């Protein structure tokens, strides 16, 4: 049975690989110089997703303990990746604050979804949903920190002006935080307002392909979109306030 399933997977993936071949041929024809990169990222995605599939099969056997361990690993990796990219001196504090921010948005999202039983408190639901939260929160945090650091560096005279007039560091930084978070959340707001009109999002597509009721699929998808939008706002504001001293001295 397992061999039959694997053979079917290989056949289906072989057909689907036509998309990659088309992209490579066009890149080669137009001399874009990215043919090897297209092949590399495509094969890398294949390997990573299959590894993820086998890891999830193993984790699901441990129940919610395995789910929490998986979420902990995702939060740790997300914190490390952003810490490495953001140009702030105190990397240790940045990592801790990033971890706290990811953990906060994850706990809030998990509580809102599972306490009223909007979704079942099971690994098969919790892991992918929290993965969506962490992944989208990564983008918002990165954009917010990049934006506020650039603003502080380019408009330092304005910041010192607020401080000279007697404002506290938090009060002086608040206008910068406001603009940075607004900029960081705009991409998610655009995705939220265009969902169902311009594109059908991944979670809903997956449910429809698995034979779910379209109305139920739409309900779950809008819950996910609201959850991600909320997490984006919370994470953007929280990380800026937690790191305000380091941001001012950037």
Swiss-Prot record:
It is a multi-pass membrane protein. The keyword rRNA processing does not apply. It holds the Pfam family UPF0014. It is found in: Cell membrane. The chain crosses the membrane at residues 6-26, 49-69, 95-115, 124-144, 195-215, 222-242. InterPro entries: UPF0014_fam. GO terms for cellular component: plasma membrane. It comes from the Archaea. Keywords: Cell membrane, Membrane, Transmembrane, Transmembrane helix. Its main location: membrane. Belongs to the UPF0014 family. This is UPF0014 membrane protein MJ0938. The lineage of its organism: Archaea, Methanobacteriati, Methanobacteriota, Methanomada group, Methanococci.
